[in-house]
Amino acid sequence: MISIILVMIGGGFGAIARSAITDYFNHKFTSKLPIATLIVNLVGSFLIGLTIGLSISTSWFPAFFVTGFLGGLTTFSTLAKELTLMMTPKFNINLFLNYSLLQFIIGFIACYIGYHI
């Protein structure tokens, strides 16, 4: 039961962090790519890899930080929405593919680097 509470608390903080980061980057930068989602997903992927690589496995930390906070910070559903919204009548296949590759391949590389630090 305690791990469920830790996931809920961590997830809440992660979602708040994502919202703040998204607001900041959406006001500071204009881009055809959704930069804020890219940043939170890449940072989250790196931190997940780092946490796993460091074998931080106290009884509470993975539930609170990895599943909760980083699960709330990163967002696959927003990525799916953004990719769907790119498929408009003015669909740009290069933009769509570049953003997809950045998210998935660079996200994996970020996790891998974090794991091996």
From Swiss-Prot:
It catalyses: fluoride(in) = fluoride(out). Na(+) binds at G71, T74. GO terms for molecular function: fluoride channel activity; metal ion binding. The keyword Cell membrane applies. The keyword Secreted does not apply. Belongs to the fluoride channel Fluc/FEX (TC 1.A.43) family. This is Fluoride-specific ion channel FluC 2.
